[in-house]
């Protein structure tokens, strides 16, 4: 951990990228545990459990708080960014996922034998609130643990 910090002095950025990567990597085993299906595409796609976007922005905000303080402008910007990203993940993109699922079902039922398109819409775009909370917790707690190691 210390060698990584020496190479890249921005600890908040290191923490954010680390927890984004971990959250992306965890998606495949979690999907297998829940659905008994291995889907390696989850490593490079949006959506799923946990929210890697939430992990990233919460790790960044936590790093900014630890590095610059809770009263800093940097922390305020990171918190605002985190709120926007998490709202988008659980709200707007989740709604788009539901619409894609319904449109795919309509196409399947309405145009049986007469496909209008071979390509289906991607249904896994957003996150449930729980997936966002888990991602956020990973980012916050993970960054706190990393910071502790960096301080020793």
Specify the residue positions occupied by each region the protein language model found.
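Helix-loop-helix hairpins and the membrane-proximal interhelical loops
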Residues: 1-25, 33-36
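General secondary-structure edge motif
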Residues: 2-5, 9, 31, 83, ...
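Membrane-embedded catalytic cores of phosphoryl/pyrophosphoryl-handling enzymes
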Residues: 21, 25, 40-152
